Structure formats: C-alpha cells, structure tokens
C-alpha cells in the first residue's frame, strides 16, 4: 500500500500562551488516537505550535484502510435447515435481511454451537475520506475551557479560525474543517511577512514558514530563546533566571524570537529582589539576571516578536514600561517601614484565621507558646522562637505582601533585618513556610524549623479539633501537604520526638476551643502517620518496604525513617529474598502454634542444623543488640543477613512440628528467638521477591 506525508495546519488569531503547548500535545494525542482507531498505519505524527497556528505532520501514513471482512451472525446450523436440508424460515429471514443467497453463507463455531454467518467483504476507506473527520474530532476534543464563535462561522474554537491547510504530499485534500475550506495556503509573520505563503508539498512546511519569519517548531523556538538569553546574560557576567513555566509562556508569545537586554535604575535594588523579580516575571514576562552570589542585577531580558532595525527603541520602550512597576514595589517597601512589624498585631487581631479558631493574632500567640515548648526539641533559643512566632504573620498586613502575596514571610525577613532583629529571628520569618512543596528546601535556622513546625501543627490540630479534617478531594488548608512537611522537618533535622508528643503540645494551646482532645489526638496522629506512604512513594520507596516497617508501628518519624532506610538497604543484599521467605515461613508457623514460654534449652537440640542455628543466634545476638539500641538498623540487618545459610539448613534438615512435644516446643522457641531479632527492625516477611 502506498504511503503519504500529510500536513495539517489550523491558522487562528493569537492563541492563549499558557495553553499553547497543552493544545498542541492534545491535538497530537487525539489525532494519533483517531488514526489508530481508523486502522491507518503511520510512522510518526509531529506536532507544531506557534502563537497563530497549530499544525501536524503525519509521516508515512497509509493511503487507505486495509480491506476487511465483517461477519454477520445468523441462526444455529441446527435451526437453519430442515430435515431435508432446505433453509428454514429463520435462515430465509436472515438471508433476506442481508440480501444474499445460500451460496454466500458460511459457518463458524460459537462455543459448542455451529452457526450460520455471512462474511461481507468491506473495502477500506481512503485517507482523504477519513482524515478530515479524524482531525475535526481531535479539535472538538481539545481541552478548551471556554470556546468562542466568530461572526462568520458556525463552529467554535478557543480563538477565531482564519485558515486551514490540509496537504497530502503535493495535493490538497478536499475538506471543510472548523467551517473553513482546506487549502495549501498559509501565512507568515504578521509584520515581517504578512503575505500568503503557498505550500508546494507537505514537507516544505517548516522551511517555508522560516523564510516567512515563523519558527513553527515549539522546541526549536524555545532553544533559540535560551541560547539568546544565555548569550546576553554572559555579556554582563550574569545568569538568567529562566523558570520553565515562564520560558514556555514566552515561547508561546513569539513566532520569531529576538532577545534584547535592557536595564533599570540601580536604586531599585534596595527593594527586596523577590518583589522585583516577581513583577518583572509575572507582569512583563522578562527574564531577570543575577550574579554568582544570587543577587539581582540591574538588567532584564525581554523577548521581542520582531527583528527591529532599531532595537534600541524596543529596549527603551520596555525600560519605560517596567519603571512604574518597580516604582510601585519601591513605594510599598518604603511605606511598610514606617510601621514596625510588632505594631501590626492590632491588624492581625482583625484578620480571621478560621471562624472557630480565631484571628491571626490568636494563631500567632498559640504558635509562640508552642514554639517555646518545641525549642527544647529543636535546640532553638526559646526567646528567639517566641519573638519570631509573634512577628511571623505581621507582614500579612503589609502593603508589599498585599501587592505580592507570594512574598509573605520574605517581606517579614527584610523588615526584621531593617529593624535590627538577629539572624535567627529575621530568617525564621521567611523560613516558616518551608518546605512549600515536595522536594523544597527546609529552614536553615533552628528558629525557622521551630516556627515551621509550630505553624503547621497548630493548623492541623485545630482543623481536626473542629471536625474539618480533609475528605476526598477537599483539603482547603492543604493539610496533606503540610503533614508531609511536618514529617520532613522532624526526620531531616533528626528530631527525636513522637508524633503524639507533638500533637499533645499543639492541643495545649487550644484549651476548651477543641472539645474532644482524645478524638482529636487520635485522628491527628493517625492522619500524620498515614502520610508516610505518600512521602516515601515520592522518594521511590516500594510499598512492601513501608509495610514491613509499619507492621511495628514506630511512634517516632525519625525512628520510622531509619527503619525504612535499613529495610531498603537490606532488600539489595543477595540474602534478602531467601531471608524474607524464611521469615514468612517462620511467621506462618508461629501464627498457628503458640510459642511455649521460656528460652531455648540447648540440651534439647538434637539435629546438627538446629544446633548450628542456635549457635549462630547466640553469636549474633550480642552483636546486634547494641546496634538496635543505637538505632543503627541498617548495620543490624546486615549482620542478621549472615543467618541465611544456617536458616536454610535448618528448614532443609529439621522437622519443627516433631512428634516429641519437647523437641517441638524447643524448636518453636528457637524460631521465636530468630523472629524477634528480625522484627526488632521490621517485619521482613512481607517483602516481595
């Protein structure tokens, strides 16, 4: 069968930049799905996207579907013919319905019944016939929240459609898509090459558009932007901040990218750089530049959509536009300094945290008491912890945070520094929100760790205390993410404390506000322990490793983590699979038989294999017990791995369930001793091979 290259392009008014990449990928996926469902084979489907177009290149696609046979089932053979072999009324009705004669009938086996059927030859439909509907269906299925209809069109799309190209090699496929007749005419850059571009062949698409100042390939356009931005940054010994989302958005805004470096007045560098970066990135779509120390430099890079003969005009225009933005940030920053952080508590007293749990000032005072209590665990200075907690939420009332909400905490750090607070206090104000997401950094200061823990615990316990725990997809206070943050803060700072101890400390701050302390405690502890799975699955830890540790229900997150790491290491050992299987066998035996009281009686060991296992247990126990006491579980399991050979020999040569009651009891005690050594770390019997 012959193969073809097909080009499809949908030309539109400017598409939403934040959706362009998603629309391209969805169009590609939906088209691939449609081709597969139609039985049209192809080598690849390449997808392109630029501000005014979505396009696909389908390589080596079949010219038509393969011819097939469709089976139409009739009555059972037994019911199809009478005693003389003539068609019954049932068969005659079937043939009449299909418009066929007896000569065209076939039979097939349906289970134990042989049935009559008609095998109809079905000629495959052509690519030209099938493709327009496949593409239209793909467009209809795109993830578009709000569609619009242009005045002259009966169809809807995310933006008004202006032209459609549908080429099979060098031939136009006759079709109407999105109420536009397909052709071989596309259009170049709106300003550099606004005239029509006629495509002679589907393979000419990318080259023809580049001549018309359009880079249709999204990744190529993006790589060009990255190269240009890096070159401009290198020229001033700086590094560009290039967030992935911003890079995608800028790539979606331009057809012919030209990066330009501009400047702003150095006086604005006195403003918190986070505010300047936020306004330049979010509002202006600029790339900011920093030096080797991470300090913002008085430059920014804009990506223009035109290749100007006088780029200075574009640069000056952008400098003029950004100046008021930076001036606003400077104004807010200076205005805020007129009111000390501590004096803002009155405003916090009028800001509701949660209707039943009080104001933000109520929360601040609870956090302060909790932070003082936690200081003995985190090693923070209690006075620093209390002061930082009372100042922690004050910047929420500031002008700067009002304009840039993402600067909460960060603004507080700047103001605290200006007011002369020590490093522990000032840095804690920004660190209180860390970690913000999975894999985010943790607070560097002990005070920051203390406030971050206190804030999260206060919220979690309070919300559980008023019966508003997360349910299903509803988690308005982001308690699931917060719980993982609590676990990370404990584990990665090596805080030796149980979850219940922390919950109890947080409960003390609520007093009578929380009516049922016992239920709240139980629910909050269970919730936090339930987040272990999400935390460790993000790290790639297998579920059976978690189950092995959870079987022991460790109370301390730090202890839990050490056990997880130990089991994770253990399962990489060559002895692990055999020892896990042996432990499972031991667990099954002990589950069916009550372990007799007392210790193993050495004199009652009669088989060489059981004597050898006992001797190994006696030798390894005094080595392992100090390791367990030191919570060096990895070393403990590594030592226990040496028991594989004597355990295997024991099960090969010893009958545990001996007829002699004394021998049986002694062997059960021996297995219990073995089992207890392993379960002092984890229940390795649940590990899969």
UniProtKB/Swiss-Prot annotation:
Q: Which subcellular locations apply to this protein?
A: Cytoplasm
- Coiled-coil annotation reads none
Source organism, top-level taxon: Bacteria
This entry's Enzyme Commission designation comes to 6.1.1.14
Molecular-function annotations in GO: arginine-tRNA ligase activity; ATP binding; glycine-tRNA ligase activity
- InterPro entries recorded: DALR_anticod-bd, Gly-tRNA-synth_bsu, Gly-tRNA-synth_heterodimer
GO CC list? cytosol
Query: Which reactions is this enzyme annotated as catalysing?
Result: tRNA(Gly) + glycine + ATP = glycyl-tRNA(Gly) + AMP + diphosphate
Root EC class = ligase
Q: Does the keyword ATP-binding apply?
A: yes
Q: Name the predominant localization.
A: cytoplasm
Q: Which SUPFAM superfamilies does this chain map to?
A: HD-domain/PDEase-like (SSF109604)
Key words of the record: Aminoacyl-tRNA synthetase, ATP-binding, Cytoplasm, Ligase, Nucleotide-binding, Protein biosynthesis
Concerning PROSITE patterns, the annotation shows: AA_TRNA_LIGASE_II_GLYAB
Q: Do you know which Pfam families this protein is assigned to?
A: DALR_1 (PF05746), tRNA_synt_2f (PF02092)
What GO biological process term is on the record, naming one? glycyl-tRNA aminoacylation
- Which family does the similarity line name? Belongs to the class-II aminoacyl-tRNA synthetase family.
Q: Which NCBIfam families match?
A: glyS
How does the annotation summarize its subunit structure? Tetramer of two alpha and two beta subunits.
Protein name (Swiss-Prot/TrEMBL): Glycine--tRNA ligase beta subunit
Species this protein is from: Acinetobacter baumannii (strain AYE)
Gene name tied to this protein: glyS
